Amino acid sequence: MTDHALLLVNLGSPASTSVADVRSYLNQFLMDPYVIDLPWPVRRLLVSLILIKRPEQSAHAYASIWWDEGSPLVVLSRRLQQQMTAQWTQGPVELAMRYGEPSIESVLTRLATQGIRNVTLAPLYPQFADSTVTTVIEEAKRVVRDKKLDVQFSILQPFYDQPEYLDALVASARPYVEQDYDHLLLSFHGLPERHLTKLDPTGQHCFKDADCCKNASAEVLKTCYRAQCFSVARDFAERMGLPEGKWSVAFQSRLGRAKWIEPYTEARLEALAQQGVKKLLVMCPAFVADCIETLEEIGDRGLEQFREAGGEELVLVPCLNDDPQWAKALNTLCERAPTAL
């Protein structure tokens, strides 16, 4: 064993389904300026208003999908960590969560006390967004700076277009996609439109026309979450040999009144049912592990909404989770992660 650790980082989860734990988790999550990018006083006021009712609602949702072992996201991430231990030969494999426990700070501090000087930081997000990738990187840098840790990072870059990831995604979904169904919906997590426009390096591309994501230049694509999502969908459909009209893309998990990227998953579920789709497959390629957004938002509420609109069956395709091919692909991606300056 060497002194080069691999640190897998996912979003996080409440410690339990209690309202108090959910409130604490939501407060930490929503107060992140990369998540709600408003001035602190406005963000504090908005989050305080959200926390009046949302914790109880979310606690009920978490309880409906909670496993005996704990949070599905944490359990599945632990299983992936175990898979990666057999793949990563350069040192220990650790898991941290951006919000909740185990925290990035606690894990990095422990690694440093063990003499670990090199860490490959792996945000487990295929597509780039400030609210996912950037906040993980900046939190890790903050810990090293504040704790004065002697740690050098290599950082896994967004891997939405990497063949290893796409091949693993296709292989894990193939048993479901090869079954009989009417339509495949690829539902990605949504973002406020302003999160994209503020990162547009040209200042003249995002949302200027209906095909902006399809026609994105390499410069724009590097930081455009929506364009990267459409890229994943197109590459997946091409690898699976899916014809036009058999699949579509939508964006879920809206929060607040700001304009979010479209089309919205809720509207798409209703429209597909009204168009005569009876059996619908849904994949959520923005997530590498099943979580409340997949299991509850799509698997439970999405199914109910689809049926109310006239659909009959909604099949949720599992995320990559601890799939062995995914673990092998992730190891390859992490091995070539560049060293941060």
UniProtKB/Swiss-Prot annotation:
The keyword Lyase applies. Pathway: Porphyrin-containing compound metabolism; protoheme biosynthesis; protoheme from protoporphyrin-IX: step 1/1. The keyword Magnesium does not apply. One of its GO terms (cellular component) is cytoplasm. It comes from the Bacteria. It catalyses: heme b + 2 H(+) = protoporphyrin IX + Fe(2+). NCBIfam families: hemH. This is Ferrochelatase. It comes from Pseudomonas fluorescens (strain SBW25). The gene is hemH.
